[in-house]
Amino acid sequence: MGYEEQLDRALEETPDIEGTAARFSVPDPDVRQEGNATVYENFQPTIDRLDREESHVMKFLQNELGTSANIDERGRLRLTGEFRQARVEEAINDYVEGYVICPECGLPDTRLEKENGAEVLRCEACGARSPAGN
């Protein structure tokens, strides 16, 4: 068997590598109204999936939604005001784009670091360093 035949055989037997969408997904926000507050029921599973500090994500959501928030004793995020599920999901997706997904390789294997007072996204997959939140 020649080189070309071996190469063709190897490529046929190699499984396809799944893209980032299949490998990384964030749970859809489970939100409900409770009085004048919106309760993000599955905030903790979302934080676990994002692998970020809950205070960082909460602060981002506060800024993005223009409201105040706190985390209750059950780990749920309580947002002051009424927000639809689609709006909270949009804000979470914006967070993922700016603070989780590497802008160079598109993988979620990143860490937030402080560098000279600025937040930097460091990718553990490709080694890229880029400003966070862009």
Curated annotation (Swiss-Prot):
Q: Where is the composition biased (Basic and acidic residues)?
A: 1-12
Q: Which UniProt keywords are listed? A: Initiation factor, Protein biosynthesis
Q: List the disulfide bonds.
A: none
> Cytoplasm: present as a keyword of the record?
no
The signal peptide, as residue positions, is none
Q: Name one Pfam family in it.
A: eIF-5_eIF-2B
Task: Give me the ranges of the annotated region Disordered.
Answer: 1-32
Provide any one GO MF term from the record: translation initiation factor activity
Cited InterPro entries: IF2/IF5, TIF2_bsu_arc, Transl_init_fac_IF2/IF5_dom, Transl_init_fac_IF2/IF5_N, Transl_init_fac_IF2/IF5_Zn-bd
What is known about its subunit structure?
A: Heterotrimer composed of an alpha, a beta and a gamma chain.
Q: Which family does it belong to?
A: Belongs to the eIF-2-beta/eIF-5 family.
Q: Which NCBIfam families match?
A: PRK03988.1
Q: What function does this protein fulfil? A: eIF-2 functions in the early steps of protein synthesis by forming a ternary complex with GTP and initiator tRNA.
Q: What is this protein called?
A: Translation initiation factor 2 subunit beta
Naturally occurring in which organism (per UniProt)? Natronomonas pharaonis (strain ATCC 35678 / DSM 2160 / CIP 103997 / JCM 8858 / NBRC 14720 / NCIMB 2260 / Gabara) (Halobacterium pharaonis)
The uppermost taxa in this organism's lineage are: Archaea, Methanobacteriati, Methanobacteriota, Stenosarchaea group, Halobacteria
